[in-house]
Amino acid sequence: MNILLICAAGMSTSLLVTKMKEAAKQKGIEANIWAVSADEAKSHLDQADVVLIGPQIRYKLAAFKKEGEARGIPVDVINPADYGRVNGAGVLDFALRLKK
């Protein structure tokens, strides 16, 4: 599974990406997880199975949902509590539920 995280600059999600990769490994899930800035995101959408947006750019959800729907890719906002706590396992579970 390919999980794309989008945030304002692509840096604030880097620790979350690390925690999500650790959680995937512990659960035996093969996942490619990466983060990019909102400006770079469009060029990465075709590689993703799920797109998660950082809460700080939730105002861009409608635009990214439209792009995702055109490609058959679910798009949603990361829960602010999970994002703030860097809950990699929780965000990974959310991504898996979106893909089902």
Curated annotation (Swiss-Prot):
Gene Ontology molecular-function annotations:
kinase activity; protein-N(PI)-phosphohistidine-sugar phosphotransferase activity
Q: What is its EC number?
A: 2.7.1.205
Alphabetical list of Pfam families matching this protein: PTS_IIB (PF02302)
Which gene underlies this protein? celA
Functionally, this protein is described as follows: The phosphoenolpyruvate-dependent sugar phosphotransferase system (sugar PTS), a major carbohydrate active transport system, catalyzes the phosphorylation of incoming sugar substrates concomitantly with their translocation across the cell membrane. The enzyme II CelABD PTS system is involved in cellobiose transport.
Q: What class of enzyme is it?
A: transferase
Q: What does the comment on domains in this protein's record state?
A: The PTS EIIB type-3 domain is phosphorylated by phospho-EIIA on a cysteinyl residue. Then, it transfers the phosphoryl group to the sugar substrate concomitantly with the sugar uptake processed by the PTS EIIC type-3 domain.
Task: Tell me if Kinase is a UniProt keyword of this record.
Answer: yes
Q: What is this organism's lineage?
A: Bacteria, Bacillati, Bacillota, Bacilli, Bacillales
From what organism does this protein derive?
A: Geobacillus stearothermophilus (Bacillus stearothermophilus)
What NCBIfam families does the entry give?
Answer: pts-lac
Protein's recorded name: PTS system cellobiose-specific EIIB component
